[in-house]
């Protein structure tokens, strides 16, 4: 029997990134991790054993815009039903004392059916991918999700704000960095102004890569442009950009850089905030979560056509104030749930 089962959504790399931060904080021996896709490679690169059980549907992104969202919603629903079957077998075999899920609602559904204590980690309290007929289906799915959130022992949201009922707002959750910035820059050979371009765990960021390369060619500042292309982009780009591919220590690279340019995923934004690195975050158009994330910090999709000016402006600014890392609070809340269960 394993005491904690941790299910991490394999859609993108953001969930795996913050989940690794939490798992490192817990240092709990009787814990197993389940995910899929590029998240598995990420966990393995960071010497964390994780079981590859999920194959999520892919977003169809053309020129930076999300297409066929209704089709994706239908594929997600089928994926969710399949994940319930998979997680049900695992949970029945392992008989855990606690289930933690980072936006893997299939495992939470099974946990709540089996009356197993459960914690949800999530950025969102509802989805808004579709309108019309698709919106009606999505509304029903949101209602089901809301019931799960209400029934969870705790819901951890990595944002600042007040706690209410079972919702714990921890602030951004990122990995801790022990080295100082100068040490990391020296190890990475960051000798001049360095821009890091990161597009996560999917191929949705190719449009942003191409636009950034063209913008950097035109700026009047001598810079290095470093690409973190992730595991799914094999296309070759300009020789003016150094592609590090898929790395295990993106958090350190962001901390060491002078500017991070990225899609508007929550985890990369949070790393920028906690490490004090100025950022430019371009959302996938029609991707409600990324558009909401970007809007909160003053960006929109159309900014992709003004990258040159934004890059020059950001590179002349001082580094930002470093916000507090919420991983300690998240760890304490999880341990509190475990101790309460053990004392029952």
Indicate residue ranges for each PLM-predicted region.
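A nucleotide-sugar donor-handling region in carbohydrate enzymes
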Residues: 130, 135-203, 231
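A donor-sugar binding/catalytic signature common to diverse glycosyltransferases
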Residues: 99-103, 120, 249-292
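A short, glycine/small-residue-rich beta-strand->loop->alpha-helix junction that serves as a flexible
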Residues: 8-20, 203-207
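Short amphipathic alpha-helix
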Residues: 15-26, 38-40
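Conserved nucleotide-sugar phosphate-binding/catalytic loop shared by glycosyltransferases and other
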Residues: 9-10, 29-80
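Donor-nucleotide binding loops and adjacent catalytic segments primarily
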Residues: 23, 181-256
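Conserved nucleotide-sugar donor-binding subdomain of glycosyltransferases
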Residues: 66-98, 105-106
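C-terminal alpha-helical cap of glycosyltransferases
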Residues: 309-312, 323-344
């Amino acid at each position: 029997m394993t005491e904690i089962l941790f299910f991490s959504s394999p859609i993108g790399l953001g969930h795996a990134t913050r989940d690794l931060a939490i798992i490192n904080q817990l240092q709990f021996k009787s814990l197993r991790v389940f995910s899929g896709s590029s998240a598995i490679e990420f966990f393995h690169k960071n010497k964390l054993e994780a079981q590859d059980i999920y194959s999520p549907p892919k977003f169809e992104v053309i020129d930076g815009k999300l297409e066929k969202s209704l089709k994706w919603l239908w594929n997600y629903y089928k994926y969710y039903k399949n994940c319930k079957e998979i997680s049900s077998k695992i949970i029945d075999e392992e008989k855990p004392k606690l289930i933690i899920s980072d936006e893997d609602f299939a495992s939470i559904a099974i946990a709540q059916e089996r009356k197993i204590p459960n914690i949800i980690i999530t950025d969102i309290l509802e989805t808004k991918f579709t309108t019309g007929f698709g919106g009606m289906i999505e509304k029903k799915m949101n209602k089901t999700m809301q019931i799960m959130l209400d029934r969870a022992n705790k819901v951890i949201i990595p944002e600042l704000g007040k706690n209410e009922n079972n919702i714990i707002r921890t602030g951004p959750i990122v990995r801790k960095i022990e080295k100082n910035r100068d040490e990391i820059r020296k190890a990475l050979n960051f000798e001049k102004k360095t821009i890091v371009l990161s597009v996560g765990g999917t191929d949705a960021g190719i449009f942003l890569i191409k636009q950034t390369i063209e913008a950097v060619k035109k700026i009047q500042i001598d810079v290095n442009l470093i690409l973190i292309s992730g595991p799914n982009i094999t296309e070759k780009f300009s020789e003016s950009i150094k592609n590090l591919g898929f790395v295990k220590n993106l958090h350190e690279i962001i901390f060491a850089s002078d500017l991070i340019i990225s899609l508007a995923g929550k985890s990369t934004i949070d790393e920028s905030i906690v490490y004090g690195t100025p950022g430019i975050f371009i959302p996938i158009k029609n991707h409600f979560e990324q558009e909401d994330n970007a809007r909160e910090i003053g960006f929109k999709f159309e900014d992709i056509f003004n990258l040159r000016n934004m890059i020059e402006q950001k590179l002349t600014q001082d580094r930002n104030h470093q916000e507090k890392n919420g991983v300690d609070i998240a760890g304490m809340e999880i341990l509190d749930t475990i101790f309460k269960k053990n004392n029952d």
